[in-house]
A protein has these predicted regions:
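Bacterial N-terminal signal peptides
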Residues: 29-41
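Sec/Tat signal peptide C-region and signal peptidase I cleavage site
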Residues: 42-48
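Short, glycine-/small- and polar/acidic-enriched structural segments
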Residues: 49-218, 227-244, 251-264, 420, ...
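Sec/Tat-exported extracytoplasmic proteins
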Residues: 77, 82-83, 106, 155, ...
Length: 449
C-alpha cells in the first residue's frame, strides 16, 4: 500500500501538506479517493489470497443417486465458478476401488477425494481397511445426503412377511441350519460402510445375529441386481437406483427404507485426503462451495427430472430414468403388492442441515463399528472425530456463500431415536452399546465379513 495513502488515513492532518488539496472540500476529496483505493487494494488482495492454489482435483464416485452433487457441480459449471475448472469426477468400480485410489492419491494415479460412505474416512484414517493397516489420513468436508437407501428382499420371500420386521426370516434360517444347507446370504457394499451398518441393525432388531445366523458378502452397488437375479443372495442393502431397478425388473421388493430405520439419517460424505486439503486449503474450500451450491440445486423439486436425466446418462450412472426418478421425487413403491405406495420419502441434499457434517452422527457410526468388532476398544471417539470431521471448514464456506443461516447451533443433533425404540446419546456411546442385546464387540463371534 503506498506510504502516502497510509499517511492520509492514519494522520488526516497530513493532508493539509498536500499541495493538490489546499481547500477543505479538496482535502476531503483526496481522503475519499485514498480510502477508495485502500479498500479496492484490500479487496484485490483478499481475492488473491482466496484464489485456489490449483485448478484441478480428481474426485471419485460410485454409480448411486446420492453422488448427484458431484455430477451437478461438474455439469452446471460450479467447480469452474469457484476457480476449479479442471476438476475431474471419475467413476469407481466399487468402494474397495475408491479406497485403493484414495490411498494412491492423484499423484500416483489415484484420486484426491470422493463421494464416500460416511464411516470410510475414519476406517482409512485409523488403518482399519488399508493396505498393511497403514493409516491414510482423511477429512470429511461435508455430508452429501440424508436418507433413501433400502434393504431389498428376493421375490421368493414376498409371502413370508419380511418387511420392516426381519424376524420372519427366522424359520428360513433355522430350516437351512437343520438341512446343513448354505445359510441365508445378505449382501452389502463395504464392511465398514453405511449399508453394512443398516442391514446389521435391521437384522439385530429382528432378533437375528448377522455374525452367527446368516452369511454376509460384499457386492459393488451396480452389481446387486444381477447377483440377486442369479440367486447369489437373499437380501441386500444398497442405495438407489438399484432398489427401484430390482422392482422394475420384478426380481424382488423393498423390505424397508433406511429412513424408516432412522429418520433423516446421514449417508454419504465428501471425503478428501488430509494431505491434499492441507496443501491446497483454498482449492478445498472452492470444491466444497461448489458441492454445497450443487446440493441446493439438487434439493429443489423442480430440478428432479433434469437431475434424473443427467444422472442416468452414460457418463454417470448409465441406467433408465425410470430407475432413478420415482424415489428421487419421494415416491416409494415397495413392490410387494401389499403395502401402499408412499410419497414424501425424499432424499435430502440440503434442507434440514443435510449437508452439515454433524459430529454426533459420526459418533454413531463409530459406535456401530465398535458394536460389530471393526472399531477397536479404547479409542477416543472425540479425538478421532476431531481429526477427521472438518465442520469448521463447512461453516467457513457457508458464510462465504451467504448461507450463514444454515449453520446449526451445535455440532451435535442430540439424542437420536431408531425404529425399534432404541436411543443413541452422543454423550454416552458406550452406554448405547451396553443396552444392545446383539453385538460382537471383540469381533470374534462367527465369520464376520
Amino acid at each position: 500500500m503506498p506510504a502516502l495513502i497510509v499517511s492520509v488515513i492514519l494522520n488526516p492532518g497530513s493532508a493539509r501538506r498536500l499541495r493538490a488539496a489546499p481547500a477543505p472540500h479538496r482535502r476531503l476529496g483526496a481522503l475519499a479517493a485514498a480510502l477508495a483505493l485502500v479498500f479496492a487494494t484490500a479487496a484485490a488482495t483478499a481475492r488473491a489470497d482466496d484464489k485456489p492454489e490449483v485448478t484441478k482435483a480428481k474426485l471419485g464416485f460410485i454409480a448411486l443417486t446420492d453422488f448427484a452433487p458431484l455430477a451437478i457441480a461438474k455439469e452446471k459449471g460450479l467447480f469452474a465458478k469457484y476457480g476449479m475448472p479442471d476438476v475431474e469426477v471419475l467413476k469407481q468400480a466399487s468402494w474397495g476401488a475408491t479406497r485403493d485410489n484414495l490411498e494412491l492419491g492423484s499423484g500416483n494415479g489415484g484420486i484426491d477425494g470422493a463421494h464416500i460412505l460416511t464411516p470410510m474416512p475414519y476406517a482409512m484414517s485409523l488403518g482399519l481397511v488399508t493396505k498393511g493397516n497403514k493409516p491414510c489420513p482423511m477429512y470429511i468436508l461435508a455430508r452429501l445426503n440424508y436418507n433413501n437407501q433400502a434393504i431389498s428382499i428376493a421375490a421368493k420371500y414376498m409371502e413370508s412377511g419380511v418387511s420392516k420386521d426381519a424376524s420372519p426370516f427366522k424359520p428360513w434360517i433355522e430350516a437351512a441350519k437343520k438341512k446343513g444347507a448354505k445359510p441365508l446370504t445378505f449382501a452389502m457394499t463395504f464392511p465398514t460402510g453405511t449399508h453394512n451398518m443398516w442391514i446389521r441393525y435391521w437384522l439385530a432388531a429382528g432378533g437375528i445375529d448377522p455374525d452367527v445366523d446368516v452369511a454376509t458378502i460384499v457386492i459393488p452397488p451396480p452389481q446387486m441386481v444381477a447377483n440377486m437375479r442369479v440367486g447369489n443372495m437373499d437380501a441386500f442393502c444398497v442405495g438407489e437406483p438399484w432398489n427401484q431397478q430390482l422392482i422394475n425388473q420384478r426380481i424382488g421388493y423393498t423390505g424397508i427404507q433406511t429412513q424408516e430405520i432412522w429418520k433423516d439419517h446421514p449417508e454419504k460424505s465428501l471425503g478428501m485426503r488430509k494431505d491434499w486439503v492441507d496443501a491446497h486449503p483454498n482449492a478445498a474450500k472452492a470444491i466444497l462451495k461448489a458441492i454445497m451450491e450443487a446440493q441446493m440445486w439438487c434439493d429443489n423439486p423442480k430440478n428432479a427430472e433434469d437431475m434424473a436425466k443427467i444422472l442416468g446418462s452414460k457418463n454417470w450412472i448409465n441406467c433408465n430414468i425410470e430407475d432413478i426418478l420415482p424415489r428421487l421425487k419421494g415416491e416409494t413403491n415397495y413392490g410387494d403388492g401389499v403395502r401402499k405406495p408412499k410419497s414424501g420419502e425424499f432424499m435430502k441434499f440440503w434442507r434440514d442441515h443435510a449437508s452439515f457434517p454433524y459430529k454426533s452422527h459420526d459418533k454413531w457410526f463409530l459406535a456401530e463399528l465398535r458394536r460389530w468388532g471393526y472399531f477397536p476398544a479404547g479409542v477416543d471417539y472425540d479425538k478421532v472425530i476431531g481429526e477427521v470431521n472438518r465442520a469448521d471448514l463447512w461453516k467457513a464456506c457457508a458464510k462465504e456463500i451467504g448461507q450463514e443461516a444454515m449453520i446449526p447451533a451445535s455440532d451435535s443433533r442430540g439424542v437420536e431415536t431408531f425404529f425399534d425404540g432404541v436411543t443413541f446419546d452422543p454423550a454416552d456411546p458406550e452406554g448405547y452399546l451396553a443396552k444392545l442385546k446383539i453385538k460382537n464387540l471383540d469381533g470374534k463371534k462367527g465369520a464376520k465379513k
